[in-house]
């Protein structure tokens, strides 16, 4: 029998215990032996729980027990999770986690540490929740060079944008509903609505795609706070939908770029039809072409099931999994990764008449003009071009309230 420990007994951690018990027979069959949770590490008081005997407040209880082969980390954040995971790996125990912040920040270091101590460090649930993405990337797509990733990887903002579109609802109202349903944090929803959650996820995917660590701090990141009902309606007029897109590109010259930002997505693009809390990631491989991963990106049991699947892999494969699941450490570059590609751009401008926009922004057409605001679709421009346009509009006494790339097929 394989004995495991869970660190952190919140939503996902409690889900791991539930999955291990509800599907014990099938897990044992796939792992080659029964899997039992022996310890749960949590500083809170669970003395009234039916599982009170499993709880400990000290990681040393886990590390001093030679029966524990795999540790599940669902604490979240990095303050406690990172040093605890390091200690587990250094002791030769495999670690399975759903912690995207830790993987995005310390992934290369922890992967190397796992290899050094003949352990596994697995994190399928960190990007897609219950939707498999990491394992298909390093196994099924191993013969491909991944040059492009486009994804909707945050279910909360996708739910909000869907609400705004279907019900002509503003950002604040959509956020309130997302909070009431438990999709967004009540105290600070910034990780979701400001794009930080999506940034961490695309940093992990980019690291796996290019083979070296991509730091979240180097990825330009914007959220959806500036999106208005007028923008949603303008998108419909342009046969498009507004989505928060996390993306990665590798050019023919090997130059890499990545970002998280709201985009106009043409209705002919598969991502435009991904609504509510669903996520989708579109990847381009040099041999396979396009492949799409689609499913719910969060939820207690879907995410926990992905963590338990990693536990099975850790028990069966151990350090061998890192023959393909690995990326190298890299020096952290200065500044942000720069996107030099050309796109159509949607601009919503205040304080400047629509008639002036062609001469200021270049070739394109007016989408709407109303109550001192105008929207203009630029035919083709780079990010640097749009920065220059923004300066020109400010000289004229106006302001670019929103600038979005248009993602075609």
Predicted regions and their residues:
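Conserved active-site and cofactor/substrate-binding residues in soluble primary-metabolism enzymes
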Residues: 7, 11, 15, 35, ...
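Rossmann-like NAD(P)H-binding beta-loop-alpha module
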Residues: 68, 115-197
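Catalytic, metal-anchored helix/loop core of enzyme active sites in primary metabolism
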Residues: 148-150, 158-161, 165, 183-190, ...
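Substrate-binding/catalytic subdomain of NAD(P)-dependent oxidoreductase enzymes
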Residues: 173-273, 278-280
């Amino acid at each position: 029998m394989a004995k495991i420990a869970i660190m952190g007994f919140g939503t996902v951690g409690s889900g791991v215990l539930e999955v291990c018990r509800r599907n014990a027979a099938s897990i044992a069959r796939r792992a080659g032996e029964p899997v039992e949770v022996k310890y749960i590490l949590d500083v809170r008081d669970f003395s009234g729980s039916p599982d009170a005997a499993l709880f400990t407040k000290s990681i040393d209880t886990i590390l001093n027990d030679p029966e524990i082969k795999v540790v599940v980390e669902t604490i979240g954040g990095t303050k406690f999770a990172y040093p605890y995971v390091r200690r587990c790996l250094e002791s030769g125990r495999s670690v399975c986690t759903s912690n995207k912040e830790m993987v995005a920040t310390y992934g290369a270091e922890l992967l190397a540490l796992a290899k050094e101590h003949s352990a596994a460090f697995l994190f399928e649930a960190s990007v897609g929740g219950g939707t498999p993405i990491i394992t298909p990337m390093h196994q099924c797509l191993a013969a491909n060079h991944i040059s492009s990733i486009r994804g909707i990887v945050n279910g909360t903002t996708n739910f909000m944008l869907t609400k705004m579109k279907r019900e002509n609802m503003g950002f604040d109202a959509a956020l309130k509903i997302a909070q009431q349903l438990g999709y967004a944090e009540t105290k600070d929803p910034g990780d979701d609505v400001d794009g930080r959650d999506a940034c961490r996820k695309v940093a992990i995917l980019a690291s796996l795609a290019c083979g070296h660590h991509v730091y979240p701090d180097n990825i330009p990141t914007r959220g959806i706070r500036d999106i208005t009902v007028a923008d949603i309606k303008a998108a419909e007029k342009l046969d498009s939908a507004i989505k928060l897109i996390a993306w990665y590109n590798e050019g023919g010259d090997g130059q890499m770029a990545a970002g998280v930002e709201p985009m106009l997505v043409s209705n002919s693009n598969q991502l435009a039809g991904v609504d509510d809390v669903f996520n989708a990631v579109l990847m381009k491989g040099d041999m396979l072409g396009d492949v799409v991963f689609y499913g719910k990106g969060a939820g207690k049991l879907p995410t926990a099931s992905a963590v338990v699947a990693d536990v099975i892999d850790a028990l069966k494969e151990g350090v061998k999994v890192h023959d393909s699941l690995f990326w190298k450490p890299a020096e952290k570059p200065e500044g942000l990764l720069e996107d030099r590609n050309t796109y159509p751009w949607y601009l919503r401008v205040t304080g400047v008449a629509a008639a002036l926009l062609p001469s200021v922004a270049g070739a394109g057409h007016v989408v709407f003009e109303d109550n001192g605001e105008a929207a203009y679709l630029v035919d083709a421009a780079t990010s640097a071009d749009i920065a220059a346009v923004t300066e020109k509009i400010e000289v004229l006494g106006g302001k670019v309230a929103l600038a979005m790339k248009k993602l075609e097929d």
